[in-house]
Regions:
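Acidic, metal/ion-coordinating pockets
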Residues: 1-192
Length: 192
């Protein structure tokens, strides 16, 4: 998927809690200059990086990826890691984009206010459903709680509706399968 996005012209791909579910990623993550994994995974044992710098239209941009810990995997404190990485990035550029891959809206909002005025934007990911709360915080940081997913439109968060409904109706464990056919949706946000 990463290689396909690069061929289509993506500037960067950020990851989240499923970053290492597919073993193929270990073959190329350390050599991929535009692939960013959550920086608060254990640094000593996790391949890849959580901070990269890009030059886009003669503008230097830092991209930081962190994963929340509320209702998710217990990782290094994302707020403390954010503090370190933002200070590091600010030595190179004032243009800093943060992808905060987290479950709860409150943790995403807390991160945005924590970094307000120190980063250009905090955009949440993970829940697959775009929120309708794009705004600029008092310190000038652009914020969107969740950008949503890129995937099948006629699905439940990208999975076959029948599988998800079966789990909710029967309360039995059900394997979710990706909805692979039909029209797609591209969720996005534009930040000037």
């Amino acid at each position: 998927i990463y290689k396909s996005f690069m061929q289509l012209g993506a500037d960067v791909v950020t990851l989240g809690n499923h970053a290492f579910d597919n073993e193929e990623i270990f073959d190329f993550i350390d050599h991929s200059k535009k692939l960013v994994r959550p920086a608060n995974f254990p640094e000593a044992t996790t391949p890849g990086t959580g901070l990269i710098y890009l030059n886009i239209n003669q503008t230097k941009l830092a991209v930081i990826n962190l994963q929340g810990t509320a209702l998710m995997q217990n990782l290094d404190d994302p707020f403390m890691v954010a503090e370190e990485l933002v200070e590091q990035a600010r030595q190179h550029t004032p243009n800093i984009f943060m992808d905060f891959h987290a479950e709860t809206t409150s943790e995403k909002q807390a991160m945005a206010y924590f970094l307000d005025g120190r980063v250009s934007a905090v955009v949440g990911t993970h829940t697959h459903v775009q929120t309708n709360d794009a705004r600029v915080l008092p310190g000038g940081t652009a914020f969107l709680t969740d950008v949503g997913m890129t995937g099948p439109a006629d699905s439940i968060i990208g999975m076959k509706k029948e599988d998800v409904l079966r789990r909710y109706v029967t309360k039995l464990p059900t394997r979710f399968n990706v909805q692979e056919n039909g029209p797609g949706i591209l969720s996005a946000c534009i930040i000037e």
